[in-house]
Amino acid sequence: MLPEGVEELVLWQDEDKEREEAKSSLPAVKVDNMLTRWLRPHQREGVSFLYECVMGLRGFEGAGCILADDMGLGKTLQAIALMWTLLNTSIEEDQKPTVKKVVIVCPTSLVANWDAECIKWLKGKVKTTPICGDSRADAESAVKMFLAPQSRSQVLIVSYETFRIYHERFTTESSCQLVICDEAHRLKNGETLTNQALAKMACKRRIMLSGTPMQNHLDEFYSMVSFCNPGILGTTKEFAKKYERPILAGREPYATDAELAKANERNEMLSVIVNKFILRRTNTILSKHLPPKVIEIVCCKTTPLQRSIYEHLLSEKARIAQKTGKQMDVLACITALKKLCNHPKLIFDAIREKKYAGKTDGGNAIDDNLTPYFHGLYDGGGSGRGGRAGGQMCEGGEWHGGKFAVLARLLHQL
């Protein structure tokens, strides 16, 4: 039962004249009312867009799409609404569900969140398998169970790093009929092992979710589009010749009128193709529903635990660089320090994930020598449903990070 004023969301209707005359038209494809009741207008539009793309109804070669809405516009809910619809409806005469198996690939820190969102919106009606244990044996067992012919599990939720380990299990059409990649800007480099592993999937229905605006790097744009709809922009060389070089030439300060005209022409040609399967909305569409945004910057002191780990990271990297003579991976160090400044558990999770994936870093990433700092703090779980790769937060863990401590005090006042 829908609230007053909310209409059903119909994604497809049978327009076959012969079946209509024979009064044997196929049932319309509708989004379940338990989800429709919560969808805002822009989300209804988004679900329709996703459905038309993966079902080949938008007039382009492929079955993938990119939903690039700003953060806060409900990309997760839109994806779940589509997923549930495909698991339960069909446009074929046999009326067998369009998809039987779904794989959701996301950063490690979002595995538990995706599982919780599926449970929240679908009220436990879908059987999910979140891979968030801290041992390879657990992951091996979960993947095997998900792929078993008699398995009741419909949705596998897995981190990018873990999927890369088991990607060869998903090269058949029966293993997965829909893949959803969250934080999909991670696939902007087509040369990475993660991108290559995902590209080997037999599944052609590929949804990419990213709240990060696409930059002006055409090679990165090409990589994302090519994963989404392989071959739609040609080979790398063909894309460079037809689009990249002319467009970049037109951006040069001293570009001629002819180069500018050609750049605009190729830009328009490219837009005509990609706008069929890329949808981006900004959060300005919510402005009429929300009060004006007020931003206040609060400076938070680090905790003793954060300071100790911070000093360790700096001294350890300097020591390794001096000992080996190798240049430090500055970006990796900065990333680790940024994580630490948010909360020490992010460092703990990174150590666990690296160990679990069997990585060795050569001193350029977060090292195992940090483990003693976390003794007894976050290892209370992590293998259960809804846990995370690095264990669960201990009681009082919010006081281990300066930002979290300030947030905890604010919430207490509220």
List each language-model region with its residue ranges.
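Charged, low-complexity alpha-helical linker segments
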Residues: 1-2, 34
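Structured recognition/catalytic domains enriched at protein termini
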Residues: 2-8
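Intrinsically disordered, low-complexity proline-rich segments enriched in Ser/Thr
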Residues: 4, 250-257
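ASCE P-loop NTPase motor core, strongest for the SF2 helicase catalytic module
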Residues: 12-251, 271-296, 301-308, 312-414
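A short helix-loop-helix "switch/interaction" segment in the helical subdomain of ASCE P-loop NTPases
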Residues: 256-265, 295-301
